[in-house]
């Protein structure tokens, strides 16, 4: 793909961006400023941008902070403004700005691209550039806040779910159409946003519930000499990745229909184009998910690797640092705390519920020690990950893929002094896992044994059907996202919140048996289905009709042959029989 930077469309008033007469020049130290006349005094003081003054007055808030840029919000009497401070932490960023101009200047100029095609966007009011011997280094872009607008992802996740169902459905429909119009206009003009996700789209809901959308982060906006349908397809996949996990197929279809209706031309084959978007979305999602899945392996803005004595840990930054150091000093101490509740004591593991400081507040957590079963266990960790690490990594994979599971807080491994174990002293002997406790929650096994039998027959039938649908959706979600759990059973599934709600929310625990395999082989699907089927065999009121209902919900009905369930039914039955006979031969009970 060939990208080119073209001159911005001419302004109707002939106004020059970042130049006189509308813009005034001011020098403060080594930072030169182009600022609109009516904003010069509110923004700039004798020493430049009034950041320290605003910080002292409590007007300054940090919205985003990273190695490459810091975003501030300042509430001024003239109105709220956002300040993007672009940093140059390495030579790569410095050379980039010397060749391609500063990000602040680029983003400011590209506002005209969108203005010319009727897409709302930010309005620059000041540009600051730090130069040393005429070479550009750090730079700033200041823009007023768009009134009553919030990022689209924040709106979809936090605000929209709290609205009444009828209004929520209406706004979702309007959102799909508005987003389709915005994207079609952008592509018709030959523009591609290389970071096209809802966080870079602002939304404001008008009085008639219709949304007004505005695009931000324009440094990622590119002009394509010849925008082909394959280019548009890949760009749509970037946006579709977010909604693929958070919206229904009908919403995505409505968006695509509106997008194609507004476009000035049509793809050669609409069906092939639509399937191509789904394929590109899945490929892009897998790339992102695997990248996010590696976050738990070292130090970054989400996790911190720590070592003290003969123990080391990778802990979430949400867990208080003092808690982590206490665990490194004595990993077994939480089991002896006064508030600790032992949940399980066995040859393979010890599990307790206790309290730790998470995000500055006390929270109940699940603390699990994976015991050493054999003297060879430390040596085996040299060839394969320990059970605690497998569960830790699986939890991160599931969180990255938006599969419900308790939040990972810390992984701890304890070694031995050389004098105690001259052979394996440097390898993990005991490993520990800390996860946030889901509350309120009950395991599906406990609910099936203690609650279901006491319900009236009609209520029990309805509850069994509700649980069946929820289980099928959960397993389909796992498999669609390339995850397999060989030990998926009722005791490893939590029911979150009230069990009387229409849609039951489920969560998966005990993730030692979870594996990431892409693409997921068919035999893995059958094994997971058969394991869950055996675990549900003794649920009161569950019939073979419920098993069929589960299978039909699990299969993407309408996207697979209508008789495909028969072959899968026979394969599950055969795998269940083999599992039952094997456990009987080994003298192990099914659970």
Where are these regions (language model features)?
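Residue-level marker of alpha-helix boundaries and capping positions
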Residues: 101-102, 173, 385-386, 465, ...
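Hydrophobic residue at the +6 position relative to the catalytic HRD Asp in the kinase catalytic loop
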Residues: 196, 201-203, 488-495
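Activation-loop N-terminal segment of eukaryotic-like protein kinases
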Residues: 203-210, 495-503
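Juxta-kinase regulatory segment immediately upstream of eukaryotic protein kinase catalytic domains
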Residues: 2-59, 278-340
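Protein kinase-like catalytic core scaffold
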Residues: 81, 120, 141, 209-214, ...
């Amino acid at each position: 793909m060939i990208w080119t930077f073209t001159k911005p469309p001419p302004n109707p008033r002939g106004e020059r961006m970042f130049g006189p007469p509308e813009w005034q020049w001011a020098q403060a130290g080594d930072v030169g400023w182009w600022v609109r006349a009516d904003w010069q005094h509110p923004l700039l003081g004798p020493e430049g941008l009034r950041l320290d003054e605003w910080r002292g007055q409590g007007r300054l808030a940090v919205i985003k902070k990273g190695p490459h840029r810091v975003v501030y919000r300042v509430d001024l009497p003239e109105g709220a403004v956002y300040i993007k401070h672009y940093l140059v932490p390495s030579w790569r960023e410095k050379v980039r700005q010397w060749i391609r101009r500063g990000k602040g200047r680029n983003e400011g100029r590209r506002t005209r691209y969108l203005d010319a095609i009727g897409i709302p966007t930010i309005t620059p009011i000041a540009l600051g550039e730090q130069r040393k011997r005429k070479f550009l280094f750090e730079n700033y872009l200041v823009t007023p806040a768009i009134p009553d607008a919030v990022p689209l992802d924040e709106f979809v996740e936090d605000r929209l779910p709290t609205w009444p169902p009828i209004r929520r459905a209406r706004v979702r429909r309007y959102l799909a159409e508005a987003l389709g119009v915005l994207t079609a206009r952008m592509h018709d003009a030959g523009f591609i946003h290389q970071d096209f996700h809802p966080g870079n789209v602002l939304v404001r809901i008008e009085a008639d519930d219709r949304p007004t959308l505005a695009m931000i982060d324009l440094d990622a906006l590119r002009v394509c000499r010849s925008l082909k349908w394959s280019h548009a397809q890949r760009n749509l996949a970037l946006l579709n990745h977010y909604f693929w996990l958070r919206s229904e197929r009908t919403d995505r279809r409505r968006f695509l229909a509106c997008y194609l209706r507004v476009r000035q031309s049509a793809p050669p084959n609409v069906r092939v184009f639509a399937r191509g978007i789904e394929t590109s979305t899945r490929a892009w999602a897998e790339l992102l998910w695997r990248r996010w899945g590696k976050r738990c392996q070292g130090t970054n803005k989400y996790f911190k690797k720590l070592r003290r004595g003969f123990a080391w840990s990778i802990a979430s930054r949400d867990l208080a640092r003092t808690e982590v150091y206490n665990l490194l000093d004595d990993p077994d101490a939480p089991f002896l705390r006064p508030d600790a509740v032992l949940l399980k004591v066995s040859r393979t593991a010890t599990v307790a519920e206790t309290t730790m400081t998470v995000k500055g507040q006390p929270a109940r957590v699940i603390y699990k020690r994976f015991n050493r079963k054999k003297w060879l266990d430390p040596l085996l960790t040299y060839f394969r990950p320990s059970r605690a690490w497998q569960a830790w990594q699986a939890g991160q994979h599931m969180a990255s893929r938006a599969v419900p599971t308790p939040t990972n807080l810390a992984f701890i491994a304890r070694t031995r002094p050389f004098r105690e174990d001259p052979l394996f002293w440097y390898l993990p002997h005991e490993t520990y896992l800390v996860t946030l406790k889901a509350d309120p929650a009950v395991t599906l096994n406990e609910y099936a044994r203690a609650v279901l039998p006491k319900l009236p027959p009609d209520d029990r039938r309805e509850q069994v059907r509700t649980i069946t649908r929820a289980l099928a959706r959960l397993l389909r979600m796992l498999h669609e996202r390339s995850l397999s759990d060989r030990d998926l059973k009722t005791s490893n599934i939590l029911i979150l919140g009230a069990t009387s709600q229409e849609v039951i929310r489920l969560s998966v625990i005990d993730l030692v048996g979870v594996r990431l395999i892409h693409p997921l082989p068919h035999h893995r699907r059958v094994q997971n289905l058969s394991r869950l089927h055996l675990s549900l065999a003794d649920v009161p009121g569950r019939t073979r009709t419920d098993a069929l209902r589960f299978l039909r919900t699990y299969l993407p009905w309408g996207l697979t042959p209508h008789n495909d369930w028969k072959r899968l039914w026979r394969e599950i039955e055969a795998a269940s029989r083999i599992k039952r006979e094997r456990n009987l031969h080994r003298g192990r009970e099914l659970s």
